[in-house]
């Protein structure tokens, strides 16, 4: 079983907490993307990144000196976001860290797919970015088949804790006997399940932590997840979707 999550836009260099023990699987492809990005003008990159002048300037300067093998931070510590805070890898035991290294995969527009202890550098490139690589019109097309092969090689089940932007890179390649179970963390509003961005990120991080703590081996075990006052709702779930609803009293 594999677990997929999305990266965070904000990143940091942290070479002290943990050592980077592995290298990204698709580093050759990442180097190709990096080379292409370095050939773009500042204006082209700003348009690609869809960000403010301040962020564009920061990332443009960072890009010019980017070295994929220097000052590496384990992926699990490199991303700074709500999901990663709630995952709390810095508080995990050796056994829990070994679990996420084996099962957790971070999907990335720049690196493709990452294990938690793959050594990476800060970058800015979302999966939805319209960067043409080889004969592909965008990163989703460029990475899609590679992500699928990586996730489903010798494995038929994936727990999807990623955002739709990243999930849709993999989904078109699913075969009939492949299973992707999406976890929805929501609340009932006007009789319908509504998933809000921030609470969902919190819950996804907690779910990864929960799975590592309990060494979860199959999706049935996820039904007991009750953190942040969520509870599994079988009546709202389906074969490929597990719905967790926040308790009315704790919204």
Swiss-Prot record:
GO cellular component entries: cytosol
InterPro entries: YaaA (IPR005583)
Pfam assignment, any one: H2O2_YaaD
GO terms of biological process kind: response to hydroperoxide
NCBIfam families: PRK02101.1-4 (NF002543)
Family: Belongs to the UPF0246 family.
Protein name: UPF0246 protein PEPE_1842
Organism for this UniProt entry: Pediococcus pentosaceus (strain ATCC 25745 / CCUG 21536 / LMG 10740 / 183-1w)
């Amino acid at each position: 079983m594999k677990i997929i999550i999305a990266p965070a836009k904000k990143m940091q260099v942290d070479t002290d907490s943990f050592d980077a023990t592995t290298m990204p699987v698709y580093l050759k492809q990442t180097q190709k993307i990096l080379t292409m990005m370095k050939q773009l003008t500042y204006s082209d990159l700003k348009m690609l990144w869809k960000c403010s002048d301040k962020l564009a300037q920061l990332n443009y300067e960072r890009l010019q000196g980017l070295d994929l093998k220097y000052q590496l931070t384990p992926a699990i510590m490199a991303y700074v976001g709500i999901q990663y805070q709630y995952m709390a890898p810095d508080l995990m035991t050796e056994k829990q860290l070994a679990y996420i290294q084996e099962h957790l995969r971070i999907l990335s527009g720049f690196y493709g797919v990452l294990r938690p202890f793959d050594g990476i550098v800060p970058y800015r490139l979302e999966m939805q970015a319209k960067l043409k690589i080889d004969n592909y019109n965008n990163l989703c097309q460029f990475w899609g088949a590679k992500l699928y092969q990586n996730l489903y090689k010798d494995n038929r089940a994936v727990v999807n804790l990623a955002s739709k932007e990243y999930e849709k890179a993999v989904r078109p390649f699913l075969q009939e006997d492949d299973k992707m179970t999406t976890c929805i963390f929501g609340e009932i509003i006007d009789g319908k399940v509504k998933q809000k961005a921030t609470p969902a990120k919190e819950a996804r991080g907690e779910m990864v932590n929960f799975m590592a703590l309990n060494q979860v081996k199959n999706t049935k075990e996820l039904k007991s997840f009750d953190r942040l006052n969520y509870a599994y709702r079988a009546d709202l779930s389906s074969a490929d979707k597990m719905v967790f609803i926040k308790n009315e009293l704790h919204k």
